[in-house]
Amino acid sequence: MAPPVRLERPFPSRRFPGLLLAALVLLLSSFSDQCNVPEWLPFARPTNLTDDFEFPIGTYLNYECRPGYSGRPFSIICLKNSVWTSAKDKCKRKSCRNPPDPVNGMAHVIKDIQFRSQIKYSCPKGYRLIGSSSATCIISGNTVIWDNKTPVCDRIICGLPPTIANGDFTSISREYFHYGSVVTYHCNLGSRGKKVFELVGEPSIYCTSKDDQVGIWSGPAPQCIIPNKCTPPNVENGILVSDNRSLFSLNEVVEFRCQPGFGMKGPSHVKCQALNKWEPELPSCSRVCQPPPDVLHAERTQRDKDNFSPGQEVFYSCEPGYDLRGSTYLHCTPQGDWSPAAPRCEVKSCDDFLGQLPNGHVLFPLNLQLGAKVDFVCDEGFQLKGSSASYCVLAGMESLWNSSVPVCERKSCETPPVPVNGMVHVITDIHVGSRINYSCTTGHRLIGHSSAECILSGNTAHWSMKPPICQQIFCPNPPAILNGRHTGTPLGDIPYGKEVSYTCDPHPDRGMTFNLIGESTIRRTSEPHGNGVWSSPAPRCELPVGAGSHDALIVGKFYEVFAEEFCHL
């Protein structure tokens, strides 16, 4: 047998991190041939202490029964399947001694008399219980005992019965009157045994109890009265409006009313008849309910009534915009109260707002009652399309949100203006973050920035650069040639695409004619950098071969001039 392992606290321990640790231990157990910490046993405790969380196969853990339990020390073993052997039935609850019956009473065993069990005590009718009505089997040192002493059942006692004028009572005892004792009244006789008084009322009363604790007499004592007189009538919970005298004469009428909180059933006026009789039959005053409580923002039925009899009901309903919480009706109880508790009317609430706002967020109020407002806010760079808020409103009998979720669209710049003699190239769109490019038509050069970006300043989207200008390309006159001329203007400024023509000068007075060598017409164009150039070199004017004198040759001397210089703007 393996030696016992030192096992620290009874399980579970404060040092075990609860469910998280338990889950981790279960996970680890599936990967190792070990047992986890054994479950905590309510009836036994380990004899040694350990901080280990895992135990090798074959480990023995020793236990002893806890106070309140009996049994021999035992061990549980970690088996090959990583499960501990069962500790069931190793310890049994100790039993308290059989509880004695109280004097004149009984002890009731509810289930058993073992540790933690409870018993009840009771007394028969006519007796009251002195002491505790229950006891529990608890630990005391190494044993178990009942936590309360056995009570006593005392007989319920009544006080002396009431005395009557012109009469007396008879009973088994004139000093001790226990529960159930009966006394009988009789009237005194006159001289020579003559009957001069009439016994009115119940001749016998007995000792009883309403709460099984205090003894009371079953009713009022009778009276011995002179014939053709009536004693004051008694109506429980009633008040005699007429003079309250000891005797009333024949045919005399008295009036009753009920105490507050009670309602009258029967006639309010009765008349004294022969033999101490009151006619008609005396009324009764039964407990009634006052008008039920008013509920804020609610209507109820039977508002015109001042008193309600037991069993009567009133119904509540809430005003539009409110929900009723509690019972819709109350009923008047025999005790003069309303049951159940009055309801309340709470402001209606809308359901949780579940809509989502892509590229934005929803701002919720503290509550969702009628009038609550949910705000919609777009992220930076986006603008709201739709309602900026939704309100909880009343629609018939329902509370609803009055608008749906809007859309957060990306903010856009204004449509960019097209430069004169230029173009705008939108690459994707004109939303914030997008770029556009500018270009000029042929014959024009771009002055300014060739691109712009849609940016955000505060809440406004605008283009980062002003639109450029497309300026027309102008160049000076083409080169002059000897013995020739061109059609350019004296001031120059030849626009793009303009053509100029060359001709040779005639010299008839000298008998010379020049020939134009090259292109007679050249045109204004541009090179890739936007600079103006002529389409070809300027032509030249030459004499025919062998023609003219030496002077003529000088005049017609060959000059090769190229018009390839740039036209800068």
Swiss-Prot record:
Stored InterPro entries: Compl-Cell_Adhes-Reg, Sushi/SCR/CCP_sf, Sushi_SCR_CCP_dom
Signal peptide: 1-32
PROSITE patterns: SUSHI
Tissue specificity statement from the Swiss-Prot or TrEMBL entry: Expressed in fetal liver and to a lesser extent in fetal spleen and thymus. Expression appears to be limited to hematopoietic and fetal lymphoid tissue.
Keywords: Cytoplasm, Disulfide bond, Glycoprotein, Membrane, Repeat, Secreted, Signal, Sushi
Glycosylated sites: 48
GO cellular component: cytoplasm; extracellular space; plasma membrane; receptor complex
Entry-linked SMART domains: CCP
Taxonomy, superkingdom: Eukaryota
Compartment(s) of residence: Cytoplasm; Membrane; Secreted
Disulfide bonds: 35-78, 65-91, 96-137, 123-153, 158-207, 187-224, 230-272, 258-285, 289-332, 318-345, 350-392, 378-408, 413-454, 440-470, 504-541
Residues in Sushi domain copies: 33-93, 94-155, 156-226, 228-287, 287-347, 348-410, 411-472, 473-543
GO aspect biological process, one term: regulation of complement-dependent cytotoxicity
Main location: cytoplasm
Subunit structure: Interacts with iC4 (methylamine-treated C4) but not for iC3 (methylamine-treated C3).
Classification via PANTHER family: COMPLEMENT COMPONENT RECEPTOR 1-LIKE PROTEIN, COMPLEMENT COMPONENT-RELATED SUSHI DOMAIN-CONTAINING
Family recorded in the similarity comment: Belongs to the receptors of complement activation (RCA) family.
Protein name (database record): Complement component receptor 1-like protein
Biological source species: Homo sapiens (Human)
Lineage, broadest ranks: Eukaryota, Metazoa, Chordata, Craniata, Vertebrata
Gene assigned in the entry: CR1L
